[in-house]
């Protein structure tokens, strides 16, 4: 059995209860999580890309928490780290290890992620409490795409920023590699917006 969720979490000094919960999730989802891409084309679009993306998002979250300590006074560190690890767990149903659309791709990884977490609701509540459970769901639901002005949790805001930065930098890194690490004279268009870099 692969244990990517536990492995990622063990790098961040999480509580024993959180690590046990990650181990339990690995029993059901570890193998497919290890094989899944993070996307079909934009970033980390290769078998195992989901682990790479998750690990990198977590690095950015850790930097945010350590650089801006006021965030740590307002959030539960274990909960934010756990949420970062599972924020894209729904991608195991959205994509296949062959980097194609999965059986339920039309449901999106947000809906699938919430469904997967709901199967473990009691275990999550035992570790994080009922409010913590819903904060984790808010991260899964609210981390993706443009951040709207509607009500969000601080946890989802932190993970959203880290997720966007990781996806954009991963894409830029791939684009630079594809050009032989040179920026074309007419600039390099960044797919995540109307930006060009020279």
Regions found by a protein language model. Give the residues of each.
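Extended, charge-rich intrinsically disordered regulatory tails
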Residues: 170-173, 179-195
């Amino acid at each position: 059995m692969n244990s990517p969720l536990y492995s990622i979490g063990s790098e961040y000094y999480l509580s024993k209860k959180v690590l046990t919960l990650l181990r339990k999730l690995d029993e059901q989802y570890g193998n497919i999580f290890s094989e899944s891409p993070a996307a079909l084309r934009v970033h980390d679009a290769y078998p195992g890309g989901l682990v790479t993306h998750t690990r990198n998002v977590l690095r950015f979250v850790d930097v945010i928490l350590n650089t801006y300590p006021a965030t740590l006074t307002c959030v539960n560190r274990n909960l934010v780290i756990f949420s970062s690890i599972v924020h894209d767990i729904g991608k195991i149903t959205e994509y296949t290890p062959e980097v194609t659309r999965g059986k339920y791709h039309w449901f999106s990884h947000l809906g699938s992620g919430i469904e997967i977490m709901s199967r473990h609701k009691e275990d999550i509540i035992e570790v994080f409490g009922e409010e913590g459970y819903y904060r984790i769901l808010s991260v899964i639901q609210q981390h993706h795409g443009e951040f709207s002005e509607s009500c969000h949790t601080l946890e989802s805001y932190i993970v959203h920023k880290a997720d966007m930065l990781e996806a954009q930098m991963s894409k830029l890194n791939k684009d630079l590699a594809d050009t032989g690490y040179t920026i074309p004279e007419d600039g390099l268009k960044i797919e995540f917006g109307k930006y060009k870099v020279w």
